Amino acid sequence: MEEIKLKIINIGILAHVDAGKTTLTESLLYSSGRIKELGSVDSGTTKTDTMFLERQRGITIQTAITSFQRENVKVNIVDTPGHMDFLADVYRSLSVLDGAILLISAKDGVQSQTRILFHALRKMNIPIIFFINKIDQNGINLPDVYQDIKDKLSDDIIIKQTVNLNLKPYVIDYTEPEQWETVIVGNDYLLEKYTIGKTLNIAELEKEENERIQSCSLYPVYHGSAKNNIGIKQLIEVITSKLFSPTQLNSDKLCGNVFKVEYSDDGQRLVYVRLYSGTLHLRDSVNISEKEKIKVTEMYTSINGELRQIDKAEPGEIIILKNELLKLNNVLGDKKRLPHREILENPLPMLQTTIEPCKSVQREKLLDALFEISDSDPLLQYYVDTVTHEIVLSFLGEVQMEVTCTLIQEKYHIEIETRKPTVIYMERPLKKSEFTIDIEVPPNPFWASIGLSVTPLPLGSGIQYESLVSLGYLNQSFQNAVMEGIRYGCEQGLYGWKLTDCKICFKYGLYYSPVSTPADFRMLAPIVLEQAFRKSGTELLEPYLSFEIYVPQEYLSRAYNDASKYCANILNTKLKGNEVILIGEIPARCIQEYRNSLTFFTNGRSVCLTELKGYQVTNIKSAFQPRRPNNRIDKVRHMFNKINLH
């Protein structure tokens, strides 16, 4: 008997906080027959909220994956986070989707987070269905919600389904002329037929509608109540129809992408992979780089929130591997065959704090927990300060910090203490400078001579390195050692922060054979680099955000006048409907206070969209961070610093 090949579709459910995305996932599983009873966010019995903290707070933090099947179509549901600080996780999840359901609460309308998610989906060309949830609440006016979507998201919507007074959903067909006009706008052939009075057949309209939805130029609107299972069967029908097409390649060559890493309660490392082409079998050896392979020893897929072991995976499938080598964004197989899709850059951590266990005996356990958490979330980084021995934690936003701390307490059972977060600064040289330290010239104890120059570069350039010393004069091992020393030296500038936006040139090098070793060059290079920066001086840079602020017109004056109070620079203004859009930039350290102020005086009617712009010169006069010591070079550093002070 011939095996029926499943069509696999990966969809994402995205929404602002409390719009009901986890409840919708439960309802989809229930209506498709995958689960026998509906879980509840309030009671903590949902299938996809796996972390204790998620159940406690009623919001989805990690990306949970489950699936259901209708006839010969399998749908993997990626239930994505809804909190601002977790957009990095959202963006990673978006890259594996064939389509998205964007939830909008009928009561709350389009929220700030809804706009951010819609912008991200459009930027990555992912087809979208709008699902208006909670229509069974009192005081709902659907035409107002439609207008809200048009004003704040897109005019290109088509109402495909609504409800009658008894809350029984029905599907709108193509009998209404306005439905025809919405579908055929932009298609000259169909528009001409319609204009001259020729009949448009349903097949033509459906084909044009599907093509426009796939090209992200039309967005169908559906309605319902996930909590009370209203409109869910119709949503399942449209998901499993021709609306979403699998993003996969016609190739036998294997290609898959790692988009998520997590740890199970018993400490097993789980790696999530989306397959785009080829078939992966148990015990296959797979390339993950030019020099590295992994062997597939265990392979799972998620069904009803549970892991099920499988022997093979087909294109389109999301699989889970137990593997210690795979990292986020690794490609399994042929990297060239990965579908092109614009990847939104993950922002850099902008804040840091210290974190310590209340009981010193739990310090090692805390470090182990941080290792697991940071492995799952690259936006969370940590290190142990070698001066104070404190654990320094860097992160994107305060909600991320709060969730991380609660996770450490609830999952790992470690009571912790933290300090108030501070901004992560960077440094850039003020002018071009050079410095040389010669061999056998005190206080240089190393058998090496190094001459370096540093030149400031425009903001956002990063570190550039060039060697003017030929390999014929100084061999590769010495040259590599100089680069390693410079890389180490760039970790700490004059204020103790990382250096950036400069060109470092290796201009002169000398060694004595046979006494000189690469270690001599490795130790001397950061000392020479520091002296060059002392000659040039450095300036502090801080993270800036670009923003779009939407405020009702009556609050424009207040929002504009408050900008300078929070160090914001408004670059442009636009009028859209009853709102004014303020476009500008602001230091990351000020955005939360400005956002809170906007929310307060507009009574929650403002929207603030932000993206990391990069680092810019700060007006903060000084912000020192203690240097991390190095016993092998610090004595020499201090001697050169003392000499060059005079």
UniProtKB/Swiss-Prot annotation:
GO MF annotation, one: GTPase activity
GTP-binding as UniProt keyword: yes
InterPro entries noted in UniProt: EF-G-like_DII, EFG_II, EFG_III/V, EFG_V-like, G_TR_CS, P-loop_NTPase, Ribosomal_Su5_D2-typ_SF, Ribsml_uS5_D2-typ_fold_subgr
Pfam families membership: EF-G_D2, EFG_C, EFG_III, EFG_IV, GTP_EFTU
tr-type G domain ranges (all copies): 6-247
Alphabetically ordered keywords of this record: Antibiotic resistance, GTP-binding, Nucleotide-binding, Plasmid, Protein biosynthesis
Record keyword Ligase present: no
Binding positions for GTP per the UniProt entry: 15-22, 79-83, 133-136
SMART domains: EFG_C, EFG_IV
BP term (GO), one: translation
Family the UniProt entry places it in: Belongs to the TRAFAC class translation factor GTPase superfamily. Classic translation factor GTPase family. TetM/TetO subfamily.
Role noted for this protein: Abolishes the inhibitory effect of tetracyclin on protein synthesis by a non-covalent modification of the ribosomes.
Protein name per Swiss-Prot or TrEMBL: Tetracycline resistance protein TetS
